[in-house]
């Protein structure tokens, strides 16, 4: 591997402050690490959640970002699966292929580097980023808000070199998460009725997954009616706003669907909505999947009777996809027009306008903003 690289990055110096575009130093990759030139990255609510200071695992200063795509610049010692020039997507859930999680077909939650990743450092306990003489932390094992980043070789997957990186970067998180929540976690069946709470990027991806699975009714639920048209483009058969009803939304859905939905999905991260989503499920077989990440310290509640009478409450991370093996297949599905990705991108901005991308997201004006270096 070559030496230190100086490049642009968006540094989060402290919680609650805008990101700052800085020149940083990126050290060469150590053993089993890869240095990647990021070509495009998108902004996700998880980045904003950590930046806000609400994330108990959040530490500063840090380089955020976990939806990106790029090209391998150099590889560290012992790296066999990548070479300079490979087209890649960094993965916030790795796949080592060896831990008991990777060996179990029921989960995608590889734990090999979980502890160090949570602390914002590489597996050897140190960072590859410095700025103005200070160490800057990594984020989710990816740190895509930098022109160059260093990732563990298990946190990376090689994809079709002809894929447009300013689109497929979304497969690093939101689109894959929602799509897999429907296909892998819920395992939606043909002819079923689904309810999707929250019509942001992840909610739209859930709708897309439900449609691919053959659901006959897909009900979108959001307070913001501006989101309804897009939801219908993705496959929602009807959309409702809780603000239009006096009674709780779960009661409305139970009436609309003759007893409740077969599958519901919470794509917001609000524990009150999680309860409504469960209680909107049909007695005897309804399944509710939690996709949204709730704030620290929040707890879910319902009456045990809801579960005793045959409803199931589940959660999902990254759509249940085993990352290294699945993301290249998702890219191929997109390339063969089997799944939508372009339609999620509402704004494309130069990297320097990253704070504007956060503002668009907070204002509900964007689904996904993609930043290009």
From Swiss-Prot:
CDD domains per record: alcohol_DH_class_III
Family according to the record: Belongs to the zinc-containing alcohol dehydrogenase family. Class-III subfamily.
Functional note: Class-III ADH is remarkably ineffective in oxidizing ethanol, but it readily catalyzes the oxidation of long-chain primary alcohols and the oxidation of S-(hydroxymethyl) glutathione. Also acts as a S-nitroso-glutathione reductase by catalyzing the NADH-dependent reduction of S-nitrosoglutathione, thereby regulating protein S-nitrosylation.
Source organism of the structure: Saara hardwickii
UniProt-recorded name of the protein: Alcohol dehydrogenase class-3
UniProt enzyme class: oxidoreductase
Binding-site residues, Zn(2+) 2: 96, 99, 102, 110
Entry's localization field: Cytoplasm
Keywords associated with the record: Acetylation, Cytoplasm, Metal-binding, NAD, Oxidoreductase, Zinc
Site (Important for FDH activity and activation by fatty acids): 114
């Amino acid at each position: 591997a070559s030496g230190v690289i100086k490049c642009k990055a968006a540094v989060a110096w402290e919680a609650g402050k805008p990101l700052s575009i800085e020149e940083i130093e990126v050290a060469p990759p150590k053993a089993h690490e890869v240095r990647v030139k990021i070509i495009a990255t998108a902004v996700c609510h998880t980045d904003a959640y950590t930046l806000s200071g609400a994330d108990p695992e959040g530490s500063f200063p840090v380089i955020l970002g976990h939806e990106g795509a790029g090209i391998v610049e150099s590889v560290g010692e012992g790296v066999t699966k990548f070479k300079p020039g490979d087209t890649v997507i960094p993965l916030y859930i790795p796949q080592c292929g060896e831990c008991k999680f990777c060996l179990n077909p029921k989960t995608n939650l590889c734990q090999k580097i979980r502890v160090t990743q949570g602390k914002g450092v590489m597996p050897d306990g140190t960072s590859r980023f410095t700025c103005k003489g200070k160490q800057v932390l990594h984020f989710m094992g990816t740190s895509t808000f930098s022109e160059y980043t260093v990732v563990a070789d298990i946190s990376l997957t090689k994809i079709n070199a002809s894929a447009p990186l300013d689109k497929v970067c979304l497969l690093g998180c939101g689109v894959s998460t929602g799509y897999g929540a429907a296909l892998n976690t819920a395992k939606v069946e043909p002819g079923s009725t689904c309810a999707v709470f929250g019509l942001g990027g992840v909610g739209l991806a859930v709708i897309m997954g439900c449609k691919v699975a053959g659901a006959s009714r897909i009900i979108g639920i959001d307070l913001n009616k501006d989101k309804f048209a897009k939801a219908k483009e993705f496959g929602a058969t009807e959309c409702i706003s809780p603000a239009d009803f006096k009674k709780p939304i779960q009661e409305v859905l139970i009436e609309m669907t003759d007893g409740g939905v077969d599958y519901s999905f919470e794509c917001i991260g609000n524990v009150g909505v999680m309860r409504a989503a469960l209680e909107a499920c049909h007695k005897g077989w309804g399944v509710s999947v939690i996709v949204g990440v709730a704030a620290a310290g929040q707890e879910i509640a319902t009456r045990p009777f809801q579960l005793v009478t045959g409803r199931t409450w589940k959660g999902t991370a990254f759509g249940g996809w085993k990352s290294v093996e699945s993301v290249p297949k998702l890219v191929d599905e997109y390339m063969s027009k089997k799944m939508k990705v372009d339609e999620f991108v509402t704004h494309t901005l130069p990297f320097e306008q990253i704070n504007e991308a956060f503002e668009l997201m907070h204002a509900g004006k964007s689904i996904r903003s993609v930043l290009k270096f």
